[in-house]
Amino acid sequence: MHPNMKMWTGWAACAFLLFVCLGTLTEGYPTKPDNPGEGAPAEELAKYYSALRHYINLITRQRYGKRSSADTLISDLLIGETESHPQTRYEDQLVW
């Protein structure tokens, strides 16, 4: 095989694996409930709104634990002075 053919085969394999990984990630995402339509009975609308509320709660739920602690760590490092990381004297305004 030519080196160019090997390179294209490798790129094709990587692209295929990327699509497979993205496909598995989207399967874990909840699906939006189907709208029963305008002339639906009250029971169907109640089921739909209950399912829609559950769907919105799943998507917008707050995540605690490792994820929030990493966000806190990054914001602490970016903001600068916190209780655990006091400002150093070199970050103070220099007086000449």
UniProtKB/Swiss-Prot annotation:
A GO cellular component annotated for this chain's UniProt record is: extracellular space
Q: Where is the protein situated, by its record's location annotation?
A: Secreted
Show the Pfam families listed in the entry.
Answer: Hormone_3
> Which GO molecular function annotations are given, in alphabetical order?
neuropeptide hormone activity; neuropeptide Y receptor binding
The text of the family note is: Belongs to the NPY family.
Major place of residence: secreted
* Species annotation: Carassius auratus (Goldfish)
Name the UniProt record assigns to this protein: Pro-neuropeptide Y
Q: GO biological process: what's one of them?
A: neuropeptide signaling pathway
Presence of keyword Cell division: no
Q: What does this protein do?
A: NPY is implicated in the control of feeding and in secretion of gonadotrophin-release hormone.
InterPro entries in alphabetical order: Pancreatic_hormone-like (IPR001955), Pancreatic_hormone-like_CS (IPR020392)
UniProtKB keywords: Amidation, Cleavage on pair of basic residues, Neuropeptide, Secreted, Signal
Endpoints of the signal sequence: 1-28
Work out whether the entry's keyword set contains Secreted: yes
